[in-house]
Amino acid sequence: MSIMIIMRGPSGSGKTTRARELQKEYNALINSADKYFMVKGEYCFNADQLPAAHNWCQDRTRCACEDGQNVIVDNTNMSLWEMKPYVEMAEEFGYEVKFQWGKNPMFTEALRAVLEMGDKCFAMFNTNKHGTPPEVIFAQLAKLGPCPVFSPDLRDILVSKSPMELAAEKEQV
């Protein structure tokens, strides 16, 4: 059975480092929205292109699943609904799904524990290699779905809804 590994964690938590280790272990293809922003070896992030980057990552993941390749989805995946397209693909193609945190799984828990400290801990987060500002990391942590350390239940992911879906439902009522 092929395997899909879904990485979880905020920017700078070591997801890509861990994904590269797992790539060797599982002979897997790594897909990430970040790769969409790579231009001639340089990371050129553009927030306006984020939806296109995630669609691109999903398309690449679907192609890998069609070929039966082991695949690693290396995005933040902080909310259950963000993982939903990948879990749906995994089910469609008969993949086993595993969840992994960054190189240091305690990073996310430590970040979550200090959220209440605000400005006092901003300096601690200014060292990630992506240059992601602390306030963005805090916003990612605020979206963290249930069971931050343990693997979420696939059924919870499959019934999860994005903020846009929830807003549309609210308008219909």
Which residue stretches match the model-derived regions?
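Short His-Asn-centered micro-motif
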Residues: 7-9, 32-33, 73-76
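ATP-binding Walker
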Residues: 13
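Conserved substrate/cofactor phosphate-moiety recognition/catalytic segment
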Residues: 16-69, 105, 109-110
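Glycine-rich phosphate-binding loop used to anchor ATP phosphates in small-molecule kinases
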Residues: 48-104
